[in-house]
């Protein structure tokens, strides 16, 4: 794997992820301004992409490591937005909206974990294989 292919895979994935995140913000954030739904959707979709990728890469022998870099480091990394989430959470805290802040924190963190596991489950069901999670 040459460095130029690594850079290209990550860059292409990150560009697509960032454009998708921007589009989600434009399309969804105006729906319910107190809770930026576009940011939440971006983080949840990115977590699902990571779960699917982790599970899929583990079941396909010989798959180029570039796919993992493209999907997780690039696409999911460009799509997810911890910095925007943190800024939005801080804004709610500064306004004294503690309940909304706690709800937003729970939705982002709990939802992301749930969607990552759902992504892994999806591949497990499609492949009729195990999740790879310790029981």
From Swiss-Prot:
InterPro entries: FluC. It catalyses: fluoride(in) = fluoride(out). Na(+) binds at residues 77, 80. This is Fluoride-specific ion channel FluC. Disulfide bonds: none annotated. It is found in: Cell inner membrane. Fluoride-specific ion channel. Important for reducing fluoride concentration in the cell, thus reducing its toxicity. Keywords: Cell inner membrane, Cell membrane, Ion channel, Ion transport, Membrane, Metal-binding, Sodium, Transmembrane, Transmembrane helix, Transport. Belongs to the fluoride channel Fluc/FEX (TC 1.A.43) family.
């Amino acid at each position: 794997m040459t460095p130029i292919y690594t850079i290209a895979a990550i860059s292409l994935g990150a560009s697509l992820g960032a454009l998708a995140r921007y589009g989600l913000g434009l399309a969804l954030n105006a729906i319910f301004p107190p809770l930026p739904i576009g940011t939440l959707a971006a983080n949840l979709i990115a977590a699902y992409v990571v779960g699917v990728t982790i599970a899929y890469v583990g079941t396909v022998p010989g798959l180029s490591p570039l796919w993992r870099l493209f999907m997780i480091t690039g696409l999911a990394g460009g799509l997810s937005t911890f910095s925007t989430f943190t800024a939005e959470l801080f804004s709610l805290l500064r306004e004294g909206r503690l309940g909304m802040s706690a709800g937003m924190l729970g939705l982002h963190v709990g939802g992301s974990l749930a969607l990552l596991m759902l992504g892994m489950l999806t591949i497990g069901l499609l492949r009729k294989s195990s999740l790879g999670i310790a029981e």
